[in-house]
């Protein structure tokens, strides 16, 4: 799994002009699923994201997790994180998992994360528009294959 984690003041995802999910302070996750991803990757990602201390404490030090601040997550599927740009000018996405497998793992990831923090989500495979106000900015890339 490849996940772009962005600390946000607020974020929303819309489909055809209708808001599908929205959060206030928390994390926007752009979630890509690879063909070799398994339950262990989901467990690792959920544990890291829910405990990652990237929110400021009263002294301004990044010392608090999403759980500590009572924040929420907006999770958006993003197969383009597996783009291969080595050849030519058009990216290839053959490194991403097939849609049926990716959808199942994405749903499992969100369900596990939702046991720890509130989760709003986009619609898998839909053409979505994302609005956000970055906080920091703080942007972290988590790759479950690089542990």
UniProtKB/Swiss-Prot annotation:
A Pfam family of this chain: Tyr_Deacylase
EC number, UniProt record: 3.1.1.96
Locations listed in the record: Cytoplasm
Keywords: Cytoplasm, Hydrolase, RNA-binding, tRNA-binding
GO cellular component: cytoplasm
Highest taxon, organism lineage: Bacteria
GO biological process per UniProt: D-amino acid catabolic process
CDD domains, sorted: Dtyr_deacylase
Catalytic activity: glycyl-tRNA(Ala) + H2O = tRNA(Ala) + glycine + H(+); a D-aminoacyl-tRNA + H2O = a tRNA + a D-alpha-amino acid + H(+)
Family as reported in the entry's similarity comment: Belongs to the DTD family.
Chain's role: An aminoacyl-tRNA editing enzyme that deacylates mischarged D-aminoacyl-tRNAs. Also deacylates mischarged glycyl-tRNA(Ala), protecting cells against glycine mischarging by AlaRS. Acts via tRNA-based rather than protein-based catalysis; rejects L-amino acids rather than detecting D-amino acids in the active site. By recycling D-aminoacyl-tRNA to D-amino acids and free tRNA molecules, this enzyme counteracts the toxicity associated with the formation of D-aminoacyl-tRNA entities in vivo and helps enforce protein L-homochirality.
Subunit-level organization: Homodimer.
Name this protein carries in UniProt: D-aminoacyl-tRNA deacylase
């Amino acid at each position: 799994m490849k996940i772009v984690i962005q600390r946000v003041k607020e974020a929303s995802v819309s489909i055809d002009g209708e808001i599908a999910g929205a959060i206030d302070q928390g994390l926007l996750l752009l979630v890509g699923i690879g063909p070799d991803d398994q339950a262990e990757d989901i467990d690792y990602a959920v544990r890291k994201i829910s405990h990652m201390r990237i929110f400021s404490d009263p002294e301004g030090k990044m010392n608090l997790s999403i759980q500590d601040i009572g924040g929420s997550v907006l999770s958006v599927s993003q197969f383009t994180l597996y783009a291969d740009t080595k050849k030519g000018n058009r990216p290839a996405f053959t490194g991403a998992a097939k849609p049926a497998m990716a959808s199942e793992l994405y749903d499992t990831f969100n369900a596990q994360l939702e046991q720890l923090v509130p989760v709003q989500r986009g619609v898998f495979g839909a053409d979505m528009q994302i609005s956000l106000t970055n906080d920091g900015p703080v942007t972290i890339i988590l790759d479950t294959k690089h542990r």
